[in-house]
Amino acid sequence: MSEAVVTPPASPAVRLPPATRLPKAFQGLAFAMSRRWMIRRLARRYGNVFALNLPMFGRVVVVAEPELAKQIFTTGPEELGNIQPNLSRMFGSGSVFALDREEHRRRRRLLAPPFHGKSIKNYEAIIEEETLRETAKWPEGQPFPTLPSMMHITLNVILRAVFGAGGAELDELRRIIPPWVTLGSRLAALPKPDRNFGRFSPWGRLDEWRRQYDVIMDKLIADERADPNFADRTDVLALMLRSTYDDGSVMSRKDIGDELLTLLAAGHETTAATLGWAFERVSRHPDLLAALVEEADSAGQGVAQGGNELRQATILEVQRARTVIDFAARRVYPPVYQLGEWVIPRGYSMIVSIGQIHDNPDVFPDPDRFDPQRYIGTKPSAFAWIPFGGGARRCVGAAFANMEMDVVLRTVLRHFTIETTDAPGEQWYCRGVTYTPKDGGRIVVRRR
């Protein structure tokens, strides 16, 4: 008796969305220099799903449809993995940005505890202290950009959270991290040349800063391990050094260095940029600003006190209306991937256009209107409000960043009067990876 032959079902035929005919080099340049403008123009012409061909990422499908974004974010990493290349070019192969599938899952489980729940409450006093220290230098009665101050605050906060104390080594990190992040952010959107043009070239400068960073890290790790109270320390470095994976193994020295660099860089620039936008926005909305001050004042003093519903809603709306990181990406692993009506072949990447979804009037009515009331008494959709990305690769530090922004805003509102302005909103400025207010989130303040 012959056996029946089971034929596996045929894969659906590839069906791609419309693609721009612009030259590949022009697409790459526009994507690197002005993604928001480019994506908005192409979405008007082709709709919420269209294809690009970028020098760095290759063939890409851009998705600005919330339901399709939800599908992408809820698809497992076996089908949709990490885009290549990624920010591991800046942070190293041991960074969470470099990892995929099970390696990525293991690392996130190890990193999550310091940045969630009760753990982040331990950092509130540090944030308030650093905010008061930095804002003591603010001028009164004259315009100044808040972004540099926010960069200082968020860098100092993450340094203290990671290492637990000060010292000469942290002063060295304060010296090298800001220019490293600024240059790295610009280069991240550009292909890396095959040839090394020396230590005075942009990529050579990044390599030199990395060499200096590794020397500092060796000293900090040695000092941490030698601390008689090492077992009781609560800083992130100590937690990493003591942590083990499920199989009992520990993070390597290189992986710890790469991961801490990721936290230092990604953990301060994006939060600082959002805070700069927050001051730019509230200074142009007098009624909102007055209500925020009343909320902060009525809450009483002390870092653990007080209601913050309006302040939280304002932070949510800043992240929607002035999205700092405007895309999240995945790479197709199976022979084909069905995305709505489209069938995407292996090797393609998919970019979720966060900014375009945040501007969608079907999801956020009158999206150009800055209105924190959207979130009073309700939570935004986890697949439409997506400043931290979504799914398995959502930012592991999202809760920490939200708490940090809340404490910084509350502290400033309690100690300063922010003058309102009817000046036009500041333009968007692309720093490579992040978007900041072009003039740095300028405000005028007076001490209360």
Can you name each region flagged by the protein language model?
Residues 2-100, 106, 121, 125-133, ...:
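N-terminal membrane-proximal hinge/A-helix region immediately C-terminal to the signal-anchor transmembrane segment
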Residues 28-47, 301-340, 361:
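Conserved cytochrome P450 K-helix E-x-x-R motif and the immediately C-terminal K′/meander segment
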Residues 270-295, 399-414:
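Cytochrome P450 catalytic-core helices
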Residues 352-378:
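Conserved cytochrome P450 K-helix/beta-meander segment immediately N-terminal to the heme-binding cysteine loop
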Residues 2-14, 80-88, 103, 119-273:
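Cytochrome P450 heme-thiolate monooxygenase catalytic core
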Residues 3-8, 12, 43, 131, ...:
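Cytochrome P450 proximal C-terminal region
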